[in-house]
Amino acid sequence: MAPVSNQVGGHVAVLAFPFSTHAAPLLNIVCRLAAAAPSTLFSFFNTKQSNSSILAGNTSVLRYSNVSVCEVADGVPEGYVFVGKPQEDIELFMKAAPDNFRRCLEASVAESGREVSCLVTDAFFWFGVHMADDMGGVPWVPFWTAGPASLSAHVHTDLIRSTTSGGCHDEKETITVIAGMSKVRPQDLPEGIIFGNLESLFSRMLHQMGQMPPLATAVFINSFEELDPVITNDLKSKFKRFLNVGPLDLLEPPASAATTTPQTAAEAVAGDGCLSWLDEQKVASVVYVSFGSVTRPSPEELMALAEALEASRVPFLWSLRDNLKNRQLDEFLSKGKLNGMVVPWAPQPQVLAHGSVGAFVTHCGWNSVLESVAGGVPLICRPFFGDQKLNARMVEDVWKIGLRLEGGVFTKNGMLKSLDMLLSQDKGTKMKNKINTLKQFAKQAVEPKGSSARNFESLLEMTTTN
């Protein structure tokens, strides 16, 4: 992509949501935009803790002189004692976020001498539309970090609440009133739509957020149009612009801010070692296991998974965070009888793109699902929270590129059945064929004339030419 040369003095303010895995993909996109528009200043606002996490071991972002990484307060009052309430840290942050971001933006404008010309935010920041208006009506361009199905669910929250029973009367009830969601059941939806405490600050925030995308200059997402054409077309009809710009890991040039980076030297060594180990394995023979950076399966489920891997004798690569280990699991994994490799961290996009990997055991976070599609690797899904159950439903019943665990949790027998079905049966072969078709669509989408490449050009133009 040729750099944009006519951008002089533009200033794009980028507001990141500092929880879960929201901030890293947004910084990824900022670096791509910055590379293509070197005269535009990009100010990336995030909490100190989140910035430290996503920049640890990855200083390549610093090579962009037009990207300024800034800190915003986390909203926790001095001397505050956490009481253990669900989403307590998120609620504190969100209560203070509008004022904290405004103060940071004023300081950034004063320091740079450039007024903000475009506001890019995480889509969770529903107040972005008001901030953009207060800046003289600059474009507001929110980024949805999950998939199109979950965005559609939030946009249609009121319709869902008024037309479904929430599965209370019929467990097989599906959501037929929303385009592309006829296989989805109410119980698959993220908390805060029809389940959970709908009056909590977080649920009310999600509800407000779902009402704002039609007011945005554009909404962009890490996906590609060919994956969910029905949902994509429906959202296009409701938004001013809806831009699928992924999969980010396939876009050229390569991202300078990876969605996952090793946090320590030991993790970096482990990452290099597991790729060398994969080079020695047979094609499509390895089961890759990872639950991301946030999800915490129970000790009982982790033991059941380990026992199934041992009994199956299939080669496996398990990216297992140290904070998930316990004495029993550690002793089991140290017996030396397992036909695999356990590492504290793995370079997931590269692992899933490796020809020896034949299955992915995952929590079904959106980044993981999309990386699996880009690598052409079928999934075994054990979702936990957020959009993960919805993603798992799409994987199994809509795209037919994987399966959910029997009973919804890890058991030794259930996991063995899933491995056998995916690796040894005709159904698994069909899943592999379907995901390879999607993989080709994904590659075509990021080619120079592909849908995602064109959408990225549109995103670049609307964020840097004002």
UniProtKB/Swiss-Prot annotation:
One of its GO terms (molecular function) is quercetin 3-O-glucosyltransferase activity. Pathway: Pigment biosynthesis; anthocyanin biosynthesis. It holds the Pfam family UDPGT. PROSITE patterns: UDPGT. It catalyses: an anthocyanidin + UDP-alpha-D-glucose + H(+) = an anthocyanidin 3-O-beta-D-glucoside + UDP; cyanidin + UDP-alpha-D-glucose = cyanidin 3-O-beta-D-glucoside + UDP + H(+); pelargonidin + UDP-alpha-D-glucose = pelargonidin 3-O-beta-D-glucoside + UDP; peonidin + UDP-alpha-D-glucose = peonidin 3-O-beta-D-glucoside + UDP. Its EC number is 2.4.1.115, 2.4.1.91. One of its GO terms (biological process) is anthocyanin-containing compound biosynthetic process. Keywords: Glycosyltransferase, Transferase. Transmembrane segments: none annotated. Highest expression detected in receptacles and achenes, with very low levels detected in runners, leaves, flowers, crowns and green receptacles. Optimum pH is 7-8 with pelargonidin and cyanidin as substrates. Optimum temperature is 30 degrees Celsius with pelargonidin and cyanidin as substrates. UDP-alpha-D-glucose binds at residues 145, 346, 348, 363, 366-368, 371, 387-388. An anthocyanidin binds at residues 22, 87, 154, 386. Induction: By de-achening. Down-regulated by synthetic auxin naphthaleneacetic acid (NAA). It comes from the Eukaryota. The active site is at residues 22, 122. In the presence of other necessary color factors, this glycosylation reaction allows the accumulation of anthocyanin pigments. Uses UDP-Glc as a sugar donor, but not UDP-Gal or UDP-GlcUA. Anthocyanidins are the preferred substrates in vivo, but flavonols can also be glucosylated in vitro. Belongs to the UDP-glycosyltransferase family. This is Anthocyanidin 3-O-glucosyltransferase 1. It comes from Fragaria ananassa (Strawberry). The lineage of its organism: Eukaryota, Viridiplantae, Streptophyta, Embryophyta, Tracheophyta. The gene is GT1.
